Amino acid sequence: MKSAQEDEYLEFVATRAKALYRSAYVLAAGDTHLAEDLVQETLSRVYVHWKRVAGADSPAAYAQTVLVRTFLSLRRRRSTGERPIGNLPDGAASGPDTALRLTLLDALGQLPPRDRAVLLLRYWEDRSIEETARMLRLSSSAVRSQGTRALGRVRALLGDSLSDLVPH
């Protein structure tokens, strides 16, 4: 890669890596190691195609699409691979917000990967149904039905006390 292109890529990484990590963290249901792996793999793939990516309408949207597809691909492959036996505490501050965040991440972690991706794109990233469908290679009606089903599942997992936090 030429020096100017490398500089562009490094600037892109500096501005987008945190947002990609936040999305990866939600997709990974709080698994920080998986989130870091997803971001690293995404940025590696973007780097390989940087000349084309830099000329795209939205390199950030391209990277987000790569992130989601990498997550879904990894989930398909890991179904027979390693199995985590639990998470060690981060040592992060605890409190009501932390407990709520962990409860929500646990509920998201119990969803199938594609449902989790639909919820991430629709409600975390605030993407349209059409944009979500394009990123996941689904029809718009599939995004609507999977989103509705996933929200219902999250409501059921959260129980009566927290289900009002889930969008309708």
Where are the language model's segments positioned?
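Short helix-coil-helix linker/hinge
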Residues: T98, L108-R116
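Short, basic, alpha-helical segments at the C-terminal edge of helix-turn-helix-like DNA-binding modules
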Residues: D160-H168
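DNA-recognition helix of helix-turn-helix
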Residues: V68, L72, L136-D160
